């Protein structure tokens, strides 16, 4: 069978690729082995355009937010499920300096309708420096979103439940051949698993481990709160606490250190006596050396593409970056130079060259 695309990986990014290809009436297959340690499995779904630590708009923040907001609202309509909804995020200040910086930003037109101050007193919180509000904030129910996409592509007979094996891919007459089917193009959305693949493992991808706690509490507020870590309400008296960031701990297990770190940080803003830890999870975020996404075409194998390296911001960035990649493929629109993987073309090595040569029949 002939297809336009093969998508590799059904995390957040691969799911978004599938949805956009479907909308554009492209014929595709998606292959996914359901890795349990990907960041998508533990992503909390919080979406906003602010770097809370520095109280700044992130790179292309408003642009990414406005596009992703429209994208997910459309998915709500199509699925008839509220997978995505608005929230207010409360930032608990840790110093008068942070408070003053935030207040200054609220008077800046760039941050109009994004930043505000909280004037409602919240019980139980230690907030002596005050609280800021991120008005432009939403949440995607990630697991439900992934399930919706998976069910949709299963119904369309577009899902291959298997681990992609790069050594079984061949290229003949400008078409990729994989397990009996042929494809015009391939988009790799592997996250940290790209490091195991000779296609794109020359890219400086850095696994960043994140750990979360699921807790029971009768005193945590019903809003999303952030104080270096976050508390996210799930159901009545159930919250997610997170997250850690470590590019040194590559152990594929939860850690006591992470649990203690999260509870210690939480204790700075609320008494943790009586908060019961119910579960702990981990995942590895795909980050890059220069902290910018990795998007573009393989330097040797034409029509082989990747979208990766968004770290914890895939939910925010992926809808627009995927659109820009498809515009590059079909309209020849240039990719943003800050995300284009050609910036790392000098890092390609003998393993990658040998693999590229082996693909050709």
Model-flagged regions — what are they?
Residues 1-13:
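Beta1/beta-strand and adjacent pyrophosphate-binding region of the FAD-binding site
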Residues 13-24, 41, 46, 51, ...:
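Active-site substrate-recognition segment that forms the wall
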Residues 27-32:
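Short beta-strand "acidic-cap" motif of Rossmann-like dinucleotide-binding folds
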Residues 45-128:
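Dinucleotide-binding Rossmann-like beta1-alpha1 core, especially the glycine-rich loop
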Residues 55-68, 132-148, 253-258, 316:
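Short beta-strand to alpha-helix junction loop
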Residues 133-185, 189, 193:
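Helical element adjacent to the flavin cofactor pocket in flavoenzyme catalytic cores
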Residues 278-361:
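C-terminal catalytic lobe of FAD-dependent flavoproteins
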């Amino acid at each position: 069978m002939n297809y336009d695309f093969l998508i590799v990986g059904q995390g957040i990014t691969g799911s978004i690729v599938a949805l956009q290809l479907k909308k554009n009436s492209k014929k595709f297959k998606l292959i996914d082995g359901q890795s349990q340690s990907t960041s998508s499995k533990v992503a909390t779904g919080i979406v906003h355009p602010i770097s809370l630590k520095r109280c700044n708009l992130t790179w292309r923040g408003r642009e990414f937010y406005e596009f992703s907001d429209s994208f997910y609202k459309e998915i709500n309509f199509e699925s008839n499920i509220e997978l995505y909804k608005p929230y207010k995020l409360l930032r608990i200040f840790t110093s008068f300096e942070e408070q003053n910086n935030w207040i200054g930003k609220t008077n800046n037109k760039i941050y109009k309708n994004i930043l505000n101050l909280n004037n409602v007193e919240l019980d139980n919180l230690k907030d002596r420096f005050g609280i800021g509000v991120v008005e432009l904030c939403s949440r995607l129910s990630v697991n439900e979103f992934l399930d919706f996409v998976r069910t949709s592509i299963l119904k369309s007979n577009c899902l291959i439940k298997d681990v992609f094996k790069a050594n079984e891919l061949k290229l003949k007459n400008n078409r990729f051949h994989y397990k009996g089917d042929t494809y015009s193009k391939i988009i790799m959305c592997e996250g940290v698993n790209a490091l195991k693949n000779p296609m794109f493992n020359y890219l400086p991808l850095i696994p960043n481990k994140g750990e979360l706690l699921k807790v029971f509490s009768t005193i945590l507020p019903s809003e999303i709160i952030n104080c270096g870590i976050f508390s996210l309400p799930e159901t009545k008296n159930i919250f997610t606490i997170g997250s850690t960031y470590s590019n040194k701990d590559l152990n594929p297990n939860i850690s006591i250190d992470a649990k203690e770190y999260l509870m210690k940080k939480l204790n700075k803003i609320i008494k943790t006596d009586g908060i019961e830890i119910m579960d702990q999870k981990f995942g590895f975020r795909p980050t890059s050396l220069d902290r910018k996404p990795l998007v573009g075409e393989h330097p040797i194998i034409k029509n082989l593409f990747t979208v990766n390296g968004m770290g914890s911001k895939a939910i925010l960035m992926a809808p627009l970056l995927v659109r820009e990649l498809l515009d590059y493929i079909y309209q020849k629109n240039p990719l943003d130079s800050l995300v284009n993987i050609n910036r790392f073309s000098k890092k390609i090595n003998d393993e990658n060259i040998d693999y590229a040569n082996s693909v050709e029949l």
